[in-house]
Amino acid sequence: MAQHEVSMPPKYDHRAVEAGRYEWWLKGKFFEATGDPNKRPFTIVIPPPNVTGKLHLGHAWDTTLQDIITRMKRMQGYDVLWLPGMDHAGIATQAKVEEKLRQQGLSRYDLGREKFLEETWKWKEEYAGHIRSQWAKLGLGLDYTRERFTLDEGLSKAVREVFVSLYRKGLIYRGEYIINWDPVTKTALSDIEVVYKEVKGALYHMRYPLADGSGFIEVATTRPETMLGDTAVAVHPDDERYKHLIGKMVKLPIVGREIPIIADEYVDMEFGSGAVKITPAHDPNDFEIGNRHNLPRILVMNEDGTMNENAMQYQGLDRFECRKQIVRDLQEQGVLFKIEEHVHSVGHSERSGAVIEPYLSTQWFVKMKPLAEAAIKLQQTDGKVQFVPERFEKTYLHWLENIRHWCISRQLWWGHRIPAWYHKETGEIYVDHEPPKDIENWEQDPDVLDTWFSSALWPFSTMGWPDTDSPDYKRYYPTDVLVTGYDIIFFWVSRMIFQGLEFTGKRPFKDVLIHGLVRDAQGRKMSKSLGNGVDPMDVIDQYGADALRYFLATGSSPGQDLRFSTEKVEATWNFANKIWNASRFALMNMGGMTYEELDLSGEKTVADHWILTRLNETIETVTKLAEKYEFGERGRTLYNFIWDDLCDWYIEMAKLPLYGDDEAAKKTTRSVLAYVLDNTMRLLHPFMPFITEEIWQNLPHEGESITVAPWPQVRPELSNEEAAEEMRMLVDIIRAVRNVRAEVNTPPSKPIALYIKTKDEHVRAALLKNRAYLERFCNPSELLIDTNVPAPDKAMTAVVTGAELIMPLEGLINIEEEIKRLEKELDKWNKEVERVEKKLANEGFLAKAPAHVVEEERRKRQDYIEKREAVKARLAELKR
């Protein structure tokens, strides 16, 4: 084989390193699942991003974690399928397209359903391209041959199958229920499309008169306009204040309708007066109470948020205008006796910004209890879904145990059309996979399904289900891991689990890895209103995908939120730069060595033995941490090994044989360096794929790409604990000498006498054998290693395991001058300690200052005391 060529520019340039590499990976088909029967399958389906625009940092974080998992599994020899895809995102996409039309002076109704959907498909194609290019920039190892979209024909078939099946089992029904209604977009919303904001409102206290004229009962509300639809007043059955009133009637002010006082355990006796007005058509809890007591449901609003005919004289008014008028009228009647300021959480539409109206509406629903029960039972078995961190299982189960009916219809055009038809004459409902034969007599339901309905089927619909003989379904389902944020455990994770159990009889994934949200440096949620959002593509442009990925993967503990920090991304770029420079130095000193020439059998230095031992330890630790999804700890383990052990120590020590004349020693060190660098690049590859591929391609290597290079294995025969212990002692000595130099302001270039005293013969022999390293790194003017060494009066000392270091100060510094300088420094630290102790003794300061300010002062006090004691110790040494 010809001499190995190295092509690494002197300076690390992330743009040059990353340019073209992704296309090269795709061309090599390294990310495509092979179906190889000799390999175990490993599957992840990507949480499909909405096809509405740019990916944000949360997506970058989520997909980086998945890429780290799948890259490692691929290297471990699994047949990996990481399936990409996108979500049609119903209301989010429709709102964007409608906004575009509005700018042209058009509405969707001007176009009609068919033309509008054509426009939306065009939008989808454009933005899907943007998303793919962002995935490419991040370096995600996706199998594009299996890319899916939630409105693909195959997935649409799965949606119809599930709808029809649940309908026939009586688990999907059409009926009245309270839903989140957006009066601007005029559609039902899922809970995740509702944003809650703290609003300064009012609590209105009213007295409803008893129908027999014997008194009144007090109630309070934040929405007085809904009183027009009240059909009862509820009290707790055990409330002694109201027991005598249960069953009596109240005369509803303004309306004049008589409504009953009922007993229900839902009522909180401690809150307000302990009596609650019940409006079953405008509040979800009231709706449930109404069902229990067979109360009528009176809707007082239209779909656009104006009052309807049941609102009598207020008909046609906007709901908030109606509120003002009703308040005036109730005050005039003496019914409203108190208005108090009240800050409360109010739901707003994520899309239109409108205040959400809990609204009684005829919609399609899924009965959730039977589906939820199967998911709850699964968690009591050995085959349960494992949540990482474990605490999120409680969150998941709590939601399942308190589940409500799921409203699945949406008054939109973009989405999966509900496969239900109504007979034009009889009103009969027909539900099936295909339209009725005599279609001219039927009209299809105009609504579409909630986006979460189709995404709940994502793990198996993408594999070809309902065709259970599909090769991908048989091989890659169930999937292995789902990676997602804690904010969609209810909306998505839980629904995938119960649909997976219902339709495949299997859990859709073994593990659910939960991460938090990305926040800004101050811990605030990123939002358009705060203007604190960060575009991951901008970060990649400035620092590279490798730096961003490493930061995202290591920046928080499992399940915790991540604070974005430009400084930390920059520090990661510096880490990449360090790797580049160290690797380039190593490669430039390989002497053109080829892979076939690598030979680890030669006589090794103590540094060689140590780095090979440390590499084995790192491989073992990193592999174990990966199994537990400990990305942060795994990244830090690699960082410490690369920065400290490899770059700061081993490469520096390797310069001795590399620059020496012994060709055999040179060859062994080159082989060790190449072996360690190769394995280190593989360990780091899942985190930083671009730079590791670039360096690995320049190393003597076997194989086409690092993406498919085998995962490093511990090789016990390369560990030498005794030599590693010797190396640790050398490092301790060198560090101690460097610390002494720093303390006495002596630069490394100035020689310093070093006497090492040891009574341990083994230590003495080891130090004598490795004397060259001490001479290279301590720069001694004189080096003595013995059981007895001179002990001058003026000297600095340090103790390491098995030896005492003595460094004479005579001639090194002007001792009198140094004593004067240190006395001045001691005076300074005494004053600082006195000042901070005075502050901490001040009761006023302790009572008024924020906790973190007090804590900072305590930290300063500790720091100043430590510095003072160090100066005292140095003075004592010099005055001996």
Curated annotation (Swiss-Prot):
GO terms for cellular component: cytosol. ATP binds at residue 528. Its EC number is 6.1.1.9. It catalyses: tRNA(Val) + L-valine + ATP = L-valyl-tRNA(Val) + AMP + diphosphate. Changing residue 47 to A: Has little effect on amino acid activation. Residues 809-880 form a coiled coil. Changing residue 47 to G: Strong decrease in amino acid activation. Its main location: cytoplasm. It holds the Pfam family Anticodon_1. It is found in: Cytoplasm. Keywords: Aminoacyl-tRNA synthetase, ATP-binding, Coiled coil, Cytoplasm, Ligase, Nucleotide-binding, Protein biosynthesis. Changing residue 85 to R: Strong decrease in amino acid activation. GO terms for biological process: valyl-tRNA aminoacylation. A motif ('HIGH' region) lies at residues 49-59. It is an enzyme of class 6 (ligase). One of its GO terms (molecular function) is valine-tRNA ligase activity. A motif ('KMSKS' region) lies at residues 525-529. InterPro entries: aa-tRNA-synth_I_CS, aa-tRNA-synth_Ia, Anticodon_Ia_Val, M/V/L/I-tRNA-synth_anticd-bd, Rossmann-like_a/b/a_fold, tRNA-bd_arm, tRNAsynth_Ia_anticodon-bd, Val-tRNA_synth_C_sf. Monomer. ValRS has two distinct active sites: one for aminoacylation and one for editing. The misactivated threonine is translocated from the active site to the editing site. Belongs to the class-I aminoacyl-tRNA synthetase family. ValS type 1 subfamily. This is Valine--tRNA ligase.
